[in-house]
Amino acid sequence: MKKSRWLRWVSAGAGMLLVGSVVAPIAFSGTAGASLGTPPTQGMKPPTSVGAGEGKLNIIAWEGYTQPQWVKPFETTTGCQVNVKYAGSSSEMVSLMANGGGHQWDLVSASGDADLRLIYGGDVKPINIKLIPSWSEFEPFLKSPSFNTINGYHYGVSFEFGPNILLYSTKVFKTPPTSWSVIYSKKYKGQVTIPDNPIQIADAALYLESAQPSLGITDPYELTQPQFNAAVNLLKAEHPLVKKYWDLASQEISLFQNGETVVGAAWPYQQSTLVAAGAPVASTIPKEGATGWADTWMLAANAPDPNCAYKWMAYMSTPKIQAEDAISYGETPANKLACPIMNTLQKGGCAAYHANAPQSYFTTIKFWKTPLSTCDNGQNDCVDFTQWQQAWTQITG
């Protein structure tokens, strides 16, 4: 079983681990957050240079982001001993980062559904992007994305990303489906798989944006109450069709391998694993587009080891490390120069994870961001993430 992003929505009890001993988851939304006022830490001045390492680095991360093969060389080169706590969800990350990391944590590998909570909670602070040399090699849309850059201030450096794809059986679908409508179709009752995650409400909203234009949805993460209700009702109607709300990639892989499901929302990792095993599956991004995740290394407001943190962010942004992580984790690197290295690690690895896709591919993805009550237009009539969580419990219960 691959241990990685798929544990995000599973309760995790992992404690502080010494990484060296560890064996081991677009149309952009403008300047999200700009209308919410000034983040509490915007005035904290980032350093102009990186000094000597403090000798240690404490990280909160998704399991799989701190593999020994790239952590050990970092420790040897910098003298920064890496310690990590693996978090099981974005909400757990936000909780652990309370009070600016509590003078304990230095960095967190936050996803888009946590970024704004951390930024506006005052738990992370701006960084000097000029101290990350490889940032210039990033995909343009990940240099200053709205989910981690507010009012021109960078609250972290983008890392890896990926889309939520429509995975389907080629035995059942002789021609590729063109719409997300298939996962809401009674024709496939009991044969649909869906991620067990409240952010799935955004996927429903994205579909409704074109399926029911009268709702006026323009951003699947900024929903008024009527728009939110429509998405929730769609997902409640879908419930009898769902074979499994999956929280591990291995669960969805097994269902497709066994022929128990024929269509579902997935990530590139599931597809590549199934194809490698000879399963008759393919994927597409439907006409409505897709949601997706993008992770960011964010610096704790009260980080006790900022120099080691900057050294880590710079190291993890290099093509070699991004390529290794992408292949190990099953996602797409932010650094464009990682593509050829991915192919040396896994034949066809670059194409398998869309690292060489044209910009038109990336513009079909709406990346996760935290649903807040204050909409991007300044109105306070959007449904916040707490209500998303409550609704998801009702949908899946």
Range-by-range predicted roles:
Residues 21-42:
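C-terminal region of N-terminal signal peptides and the immediate post-cleavage residues
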Residues 35-118:
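Early extracytoplasmic/lumenal segment of secretory-pathway proteins
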